[in-house]
Amino acid sequence: MAVISMKQLLEAGVHFGHQTRRWNPKMKKYIFTERNGIYIIDLQKTVKKVEEAYNFIKQVSEDGGRVLFVGTKKQAQESVKAEAERAGQFYVNQRWLGGILTNYKTISKRIKRISEIEKMEEDGLFDVLPKKEVVELKKEYDRLIKFLGGIRDMKSMPQALFVVDPRKERNAIAEARKLNIPIVGIVDTNCDPDEIDYVIPANDDAIRAVKLLTGKMADAVLEGQQGVSNDEVAAEQNINLDEKEESQEAESTEENTTVESN
């Protein structure tokens, strides 16, 4: 069964590219035709590319890896947050702060500040501090959560990056490429596909299209996690089986020894 259907893609408007005057010639192989000055993306290729990206993300997840979802344009913000959270992954859906990947040591200090402020409130310090200072602390906290809340539990580098619109997320892509982190991306007709390891040729401006494709990548993560769970259960069952066999062998040996001595 295909990961995604042509019907789903058509209904979400995935096939609508940019105006013909705003295009990247490198995307030519993913374009089906032109209609009323708009490029139409070849959805047969999109179906195939979604499957390739899905299988890659699934494997990353199955191997115990984590995915960082990135989409800071308005059309992507809600879907990126919702789908990343659904799959238990990291996300950045506001402005990309330089160094999130390449200077994580510094970024992690700012993330630590989130917990510090939370502890101050839990310990009742907000009740004794001057009101003005509490207001400033709350503003700082809200700002940190807004920009770093989606990566506050990211203790090490992700094993894959999923981006919506490579043009918009060029800084995130540059950092990922420096660290050789594979990139999956929704790539419209005005983008450079060479920057992306797993290209999903699609409309990156329609909310429904972005939600559909981001959701499929989250599904891939969840399916991979299910594979991990199944493997862990199988491994545990094998261990229990081995222990049972060893126990039975020991009992058998003990019985034989008793018989021989009698």
UniProtKB/Swiss-Prot annotation:
GO terms for cellular component: cytosolic small ribosomal subunit. Keywords: Ribonucleoprotein, Ribosomal protein. GO terms for biological process: translation. It comes from the Bacteria. Signal peptide: none annotated. The keyword Ribonucleoprotein applies. InterPro entries: Ribosomal_uS2 (IPR001865), Ribosomal_uS2_bac/mit/plastid (IPR005706), Ribosomal_uS2_CS (IPR018130), Ribosomal_uS2_flav_dom_sf (IPR023591). The keyword Ribosomal protein applies. Residues 243-254 have a biased composition (Acidic residues). GO terms for molecular function: structural constituent of ribosome. Disulfide bonds: none annotated. Pfam families: Ribosomal_S2 (PF00318). Residues 240-262 are annotated as: Disordered. Coiled coil: none annotated. NCBIfam families: rpsB_bact (TIGR01011). Belongs to the universal ribosomal protein uS2 family. This is Small ribosomal subunit protein uS2. It comes from Staphylococcus haemolyticus (strain JCSC1435). The gene is rpsB.
